[in-house]
């Protein structure tokens, strides 16, 4: 859990913004959304594999686009 110390004479809005930013960096909301419903291990592996394939395809597309523009 991210912890922030409220500085002297610091407005509440600024402290809240810093807390939200630290929660976002820690990935707490993404973790909560991921754990909201139970996901079977096979489904979890399938989703992870699909995202890896998508990442790889995106990387290849970027590299191919870079090569075609440099002629």
Curated annotation (Swiss-Prot):
GO BP annotations, alphabetical order: translation
Where in the sequence does UniProt note compositional bias of the Basic and acidic residues kind? 60-71
Q: Where is the composition biased (Basic residues)?
A: 46-59
Keywords, A to Z, come to: Ribonucleoprotein, Ribosomal protein
InterPro entries from the UniProt entry: Ribosomal_bS21, Ribosomal_bS21_CS, Ribosomal_bS21_sf
**What is one cellular component GO term in this UniProt entry?**
ribonucleoprotein complex
Mention one GO molecular function: structural constituent of ribosome
Keyword Glycosyltransferase listed = no
Q: Where is this region: Disordered?
A: 43-71
Q: Could you confirm whether the keyword Ribosomal protein appears in this record?
A: yes
Known HAMAP family for this protein? Answer: Ribosomal_bS21 (MF_00358)
So what family is this one in? Belongs to the bacterial ribosomal protein bS21 family.
Output this protein's name.
Small ribosomal subunit protein bS21
- What does UniProt list as this organism's lineage? Bacteria, Pseudomonadati, Pseudomonadota, Gammaproteobacteria, Enterobacterales
């Amino acid at each position: 859990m991210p912890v922030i110390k409220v500085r002297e004479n610091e407005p509440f809005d600024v402290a809240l913004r810093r807390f939200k930013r630290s929660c976002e960096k820690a990935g707490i909301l993404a973790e909560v959304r991921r754990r909201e419903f139970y996901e079977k291990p096979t489904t979890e592996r399938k989703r992870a594999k699909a995202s890896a394939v998508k990442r790889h395809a995106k990387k290849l597309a970027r590299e191919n686009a870079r090569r075609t523009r440099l002629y």
